[in-house]
Amino acid sequence: MATKSGKYWVSWANVNAKNSNSINDLHSEFQENVRSFIDALKNAGASVSISTTTRSKKRAYLFHWSWKISQGKCKPSDAKKLAGVDIEWDHGNIEKSKAGALEMVKGFGLAVPPRSIFPPSLSSNHIEGKAIDMTVSWTGNLKVKKKDGTVVTVAYMKNVNGNNLLHTVGESYGVKKLKSDAPHWSYNGR
């Protein structure tokens, strides 16, 4: 029997559909690029906190539909089924359905507007090991080396999505920023 959406599914996913936060789990070529970028950031004095590297399809499914339903971007009945995830998105009432989905969004710590304006993808680069969610922080100006050795001065900005200089440094290492999702970097910027 299906279990209604809600915080149960966060606990379930933490056992049955875990994320990784280890760089070692990334695709080998992207892993090298990420290591080099993070080393450059740390050598310049930045702190880097990694929240996610790889993600299972089941977790991506739960992220996607809980976000869309909680934000009113679709009806619970729009959610497709996924083998191995016996969830009931429709609580028989749209407000209860949205509340159950929102419990999941909060439990998973998903970015919602204005931090992220798009739902987590069903076919995320995280599934392929080609994306990383990380927070980069520092105070003042950061003098960081691009891959070619050029030093770039990057001023701290609270809104990382708008910090184009930081994005340029990452891109020089093959780590591209998705500008609509604060922590997300990948091999292709998606």
Can you name each region flagged by the protein language model?
Residues 2-179, 186-190:
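Cell-envelope/glycan interface and biosynthesis
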